[in-house]
Amino acid sequence: MRHWRRLALGAVAITSALSAAVAGCSSGNGHSTATTNITLKLYNDKGAWSPFFSQLGKVSKTDIGIGMSPVGYTDEPTYQAFIQASFHTNRKPDLFTWQTGGLLAEIANLHVVTNTSAIWQQGIADGDLPKGLEQYYTVAGQQYCVPLNVAYWGMFYNKHIFAKYGLTPPTTWAQFMHIAQVLKSHGQTPFYETDVLFSFVWFEQLLAGTAPDVYQALATGKASYTDPAVVNVMKMWQGMINDGYMSDPGNKTDPGVMLKTGEVAMVPDGSWFNATMTQDGMKPGSDYGYFIIPNVDSSLPKTSVILESGPLCSLTNAPDPDASTKYLKWWITAAAQQPWSTSRGDASANPKVSVTGDTDLSTVVKNAGQGQYNLLLRYFEAAPPPVLTAALDAFSAFMVSPGSYMKQLQTIQAAAQTYWSSHSAGS
């Protein structure tokens, strides 16, 4: 499932048809006083996760007397417009998924999303939420929403291809590039290149593994996209493309299918990609594996790992605020998170939850919990929305024309300068 989409907040017209659709999105006709024996509708931009949401809805019905039914979208601009339209109607979604970073700040500043500071405080005290995750859900000192999921970004690989050529997961960048060279020498495409919606993936990975301080500074306007460290990363990416290590960026085949069929040997992705693999009939440990991508710069004190966490939210004027809040409180507990993690084969925000059936991922989760990684927020959430929009287009253009890297960086920097000219750098 490719569940990120291009930012389009404010760019998609909220039509009367959408508004009419929103009018029927809630589970009730107004504020209800009942908090049991009801079913909440969870609107989300993760349509392929509907079976997993439905399973959790049955669990919650048994545990707390509140069921949950998913309403999934697969097109992000349409979904965002739909949710925004609900801010201006009398009918609201009971629960909805969103994104951290600039998008969460925007709806928090509109005062339409429920303040969950009390849930966070209790969750941290009870050991159901890690203190380190709180910062990504904080706007002006207050918390909003709770973690829908957490994912660690690494490399998924076809174990049959690795075995064929006697390859094992790398622990250094030199080993990583050696694997790519060996695969290429046998006519095997090493890496999935991503498409326009995911064009930031290789950029963030290379920069995080080379200059993590610059990576973080870009997100706060304290570094420039034309700084030497950033330019060097683009040159490195260009070299990988020119060496034939990447798949065709215009290939529309699902990356899970490409990995399964051997069209590519490796796919960089979040740990949630496990669900795609298993849905495609592949088994972790036998058909595919997962490893953390080594730093380019081996002198860095810790391996940089990209962290992704998406929010589960409710509105201040939800149809039944008490029921929605009760659901959010339940969601963060191990009673909810263990089946949620197990069903998708992914990590959980709850430290008490263990990953089952995937030794590779469980090792990564354990290492992350022990502080062995330098966890960095995914670029999609870290970059301000207007800068991200420009970057997605620029990185996509670069993949088609690698020699244009300087032009593309200048384009992104122009968007960054425009944004930070009206915002405080470091915010």
Show the residue positions of the predicted features.
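Conserved N-terminal structural module of periplasmic/extracytoplasmic solute-binding proteins
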Residues: 2-105, 169, 282, 299-300, ...
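Hinge/lid segment of periplasmic solute-binding proteins
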Residues: 101-153, 177, 289-291
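Conserved C-terminal helix/tail region of periplasmic/extracytoplasmic solute-binding proteins
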Residues: 111, 163, 371-427
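Short, solvent-exposed loop/beta-turn-alpha elements that line the ligand-binding surface or hinge
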Residues: 117-129, 211-232, 279-283, 295-304, ...
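Extracytoplasmic/periplasmic solute-binding protein
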Residues: 144-148, 153, 177-223
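Glycine-centered hinge/linker elements that transmit conformational signals in sensory
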Residues: 180, 220-248
